[in-house]
């Protein structure tokens, strides 16, 4: 499959991670590490297990609208949690952001994406109809994922930390 995508599944061991061939073709080894660690986070935090419990409620007509909203809310948080674990494990916010961008917009567009493009994404994400659309999505908008990586990098990549000095003898 030429699309860049990956997913984890399994209710019990053995769990599985699927990488589409597009991911293997277009991502570097380090970018693949980000994607694999992200998917491992879904396994570690049992996100696939939660899906098994949510799905029966989504089939009940009266509950399905509210259930879809709750499910989308939970899935978006699960994606941010998996992104955060990839950041914490790999310790490189730029690598994590670059990987997410490449998977979301494709390898060619990712190379030319700059701050102006990111500002445009932020602007369009904040429009009322996009806010509404986001409430039923199972993945956060890319700009939200990138801003969360920026937020958490301060925890993972402390800047200007004074070096510990050994006490004088």
State where each predicted segment sits:
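Generic anion/oxyanion-binding catalytic loop in active/binding sites
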Residues: 21, 71, 134
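An active-site-proximal "capping" alpha-helix that borders the catalytic cofactor pocket
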Residues: 33, 75-96
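Catalytic Zn2+-binding segment of zinc metalloproteases
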Residues: 40-56
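Hydrophobic, aromatic-rich membrane-embedded alpha-helical segments
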Residues: 52-69
């Amino acid at each position: 499959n030429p699309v860049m995508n990956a997913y984890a599944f399994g209710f019990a061991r053995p769990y599985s991670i699927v990488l589409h061939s597009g991911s293997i073709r277009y991502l570097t080894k380090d970018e693949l590490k980000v994607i694999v660690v992200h998917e491992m986070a879904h396994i570690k935090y049992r996100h696939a297990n939660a899906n098994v419990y949510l799905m029966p409620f989504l089939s009940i007509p009266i509950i399905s609208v509210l259930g879809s909203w709750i499910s989308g809310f939970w899935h978006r948080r699960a994606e941010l949690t998996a992104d955060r674990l990839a950041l914490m494990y790999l310790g490189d916010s730029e690598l994590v952001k670059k990987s997410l961008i490449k998977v979301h917009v494709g390898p060619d567009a990712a190379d030319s994406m700059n701050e102006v493009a990111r500002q445009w994404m932020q602007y369009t994400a904040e429009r009322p109809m996009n806010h509404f659309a986001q409430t039923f999505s199972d993945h956060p908008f890319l700009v939200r994922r990138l801003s969360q990586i920026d937020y958490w990098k301060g925890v993972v990549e402390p800047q200007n930390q004074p070096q510990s000095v050994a006490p004088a003898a």
